[in-house]
């Protein structure tokens, strides 16, 4: 029947096995045509004293589970596109170092997964857009990339090789792709450093709320958060606002107070987040969670909204 005819059963079986293997296991190498992340695979030529002893291995969204198991879920939520990982030996100290490079497709996704894994008390360093150093790891993000350089030793004698490798990787990222411009609209008063976050899904514990920016604040002994939730259009935002308002009405406490100057608003209280002041303008939902001073919360939201497109 020619080239377009039906394949015999054994051929179909072999083809099916090949598809399953491709999904379950990473590529052992870049292949004849190379891989988009090959430029991040360092060698002794790039870093004298460093040589790869395992890998590189390449993963995609379908196979990342095989590398980091359940840890893959947040990476998938933030839009991971490609991953390369390899282990090298730092010969001067006989130290094995692992390099993970995550291509998160865009800078918002890279920052999002970075912000999901870092804590405000970390030792932050100047690398990429932002990075931090622990006893055995150096992690940073820049553009669409989130990069982790670490050793499995709890307390290596030196972190100098981590720094050398990270700087070499940083230099291979063209452009900046820095912090989301919307963060500049969040008020500075009471703002806590290194608490900015991009939340991809389940904002405020609600599965219908996604794509939010948040910043933590502290006033006296009271800690609170400001949220900017981005929706695709005003209709979607209105529907989501209604759902959240009804959730608070049912499971929290809803007051009769409203905030003037917005498309919609409510003031309520919830056991986990405390006092809530939420408003909507067009496609944006803005909220204060945990600040008992309702007037100050309204002032913060007004300042945040001043920079948003109408």
Task: For the regions a language model picked out, list residue spans one by one.
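Surface-exposed amphipathic alpha-helical segments
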Residues: 38, 153-182, 291-310
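C-terminal functional regions that serve as terminal interaction/effector modules
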Residues: 230, 235, 245, 266-310
